[in-house]
Amino acid sequence: MTDETGVTRKAYPTDLSNEQWALIEPLIPPAKPGGRPRGVDLREVLNSILYLHRTGCQWEMLPHDLLPKSTVYEYFALWRDDSTLTAMLAALRGQVRVQEGREPTPSAACIDTQSVKTTEVGGEQRGYDGGKKIKGRKRHLLVDTLGLLLAVVVTGANLDDGTAAPQLLSRVTAEELPRLTVIFGDNKYHNHSLNAWLAKHRPQWTIEVQSPPAGTKGFSVVRKRWVVERTNAWNGRSRRNSKDYERTTASAEAMIQISAIHLMLHRLAPDDVPVTFNYRASTVTPITVAA
């Protein structure tokens, strides 16, 4: 791939197209005044992050024709900690909603959780979800009715959904979501302390519990809540999200945000060029197995 920066290499399927880069480049904070001029190609930084995110590789296993781990992780940590990823998420979400014929901000949202296993690398906030029999972490998601991410919090899997809800809802303000009035959730959010928190901190918002029909056994798709399950499926397209591989919950939350950012970039600027994979070189003779 050759772009205006002079970088030349073979393109990866996760690389940003020119149209996608034009959408996200203005959302990257400029370099701080003073000091040396920025010498890093930020498009390649994003390409490297997206490659790691989609393939699930380790930081040290980034291909040699992408940027080195030290550079990529430095920007990942910077954008994670200075809320750049959160700002990208909000800006792109508003554009996608307008493209879909909606207002830039939602009037309704959905809240739910997903428990995922962690790995042996260690890290903070791990626990056991007795209901789902999973040892690891829990992803608390707030999405709009299109399934677009509004906020995410990652905790130990043992933390009750209703108990963690104020932490999740505090990630967004009434000023950021001025039209929001109702949040759909399941019975776990029928919680006195949660309602008390809402009355004090977010009086404009109410939780509306959506339950399966009486007598339903096992999993049941519930209207107005199923969009969160679809969002979980979108997140699962990236191997980095197949488990929680991160040492910190901040990095785990950032990986969910990156899923949403990548999804919305493809919604706004679809990549219509098919990627061809050559799984077998033309010079390789197929092996014939005798019957």
For each predicted feature, which ranges?
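Short alpha-helical elements
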Residues: 1-291
